[in-house]
Amino acid sequence: MISLNSSSIPSSQTKKVVIGMSGGVDSSVAAWMLKEQGFEVIGLFMKNWEDDDNDEYCSARQDWLDVVSVADMIGIDVEAVNFAAEYRERVFADFLCEYAAGRTPNPDVLCNAEIKFKAFLDHAMSLGADAIATGHYARVRHEGGRVQLLKAVDASKDQSYFLHRLTQQQLSKVMFPLGEIPKTEVRKIAEQIGLHNAKKKDSTGICFIGERPFREFLNRYLPRVPGPIKTPEGKTVGEHMGLAFFTLGQRKGIGLGGSQDGNGDAWYVARKDMANNTLYVAQGHEHPWLLANKLSAVDASWVSGAAPEPGSYSAKTRYRQTDSACTYIADIDTNNFSLSFPEAQWAVTPGQSAVLYDGDICLGGGIIST
């Protein structure tokens, strides 16, 4: 049996754990591990989207059935809770405002901070839980009354990027049973213990909304505002349907071929001029307009509760990106900061998160503004 590291458990008094269960293999194996470790485990399924809850894109109905089946198999109680109102108010409203302003938000970051580790945590505490757990790939280290957020052992699955806005208060009640285990091992465990969802594919859609044609989905909530598509030289090469429907670095769906000026390189979204409703595109993955050696970030959130000392760290400007060496400088008068990189970063995108690391320790981060 795989044992949890003692430093990953909030305290020696932790007995009752409420785990968020999605119906997927990760949270199912995490629940089994907790039960095997002797904790009193309750599974909690969150229903957070209702606008068009159908089986084509949102698998909530089948996911719930999978949760019930797994809970029955491993011998734990399970219940469902509806946080749709909280999700719409705390996450989705911000999501739409950011897109309307021309930025590209990351709803998973806000969903974790506001729903999975706030609304869910509050509900779990009302059930008498000592701690909560999820199937995230990350680690926590409880030492001396403080908590550190660390990368998962499986670097290819590490989700600390999405968790960087969690506070000491939230992390003090959190367990991540899968943080020390490779994803391949999780699949093996699921098969060995006979979980029916052992081969269920991982979800990749927007947090809780599911996998669906994104532009079509966004167009239901934001109006089309057509405008020109121009090159860095100012040549008009097409028309866009609205700046909200494009993101920096985007290659597909621009509506241009690769031969506007006799150059066969692919077109990429390089800039969005909101004031003039103009979409700028550039040819070639390494075009200068797609590269940046510095960024500014706002609304910083630090895991320790305090901004780190200025200096050399590493950072991610998007999920699954390899860490890049950087120099961090805090703005002492605001909750903002800047990062400079010796190696140019590709398609640094306003609205996304810039997350700072000291080795495996996730320090926190902020929202990229420029």
From Swiss-Prot:
Family to which this protein belongs: Belongs to the MnmA/TRMU family.
Catalysis: reaction(s): S-sulfanyl-L-cysteinyl-[protein] + uridine(34) in tRNA + AH2 + ATP = 2-thiouridine(34) in tRNA + L-cysteinyl-[protein] + A + AMP + diphosphate + H(+)
Name of this chain's protein: tRNA-specific 2-thiouridylase MnmA
Source organism phylogeny: Bacteria, Pseudomonadati, Pseudomonadota, Betaproteobacteria, Burkholderiales
One Gene Ontology term of the molecular function aspect: tRNA binding
EC number: 2.8.1.13
GO BP terms: tRNA wobble position uridine thiolation
Residue numbers marked as site, Interaction with tRNA: 136, 352
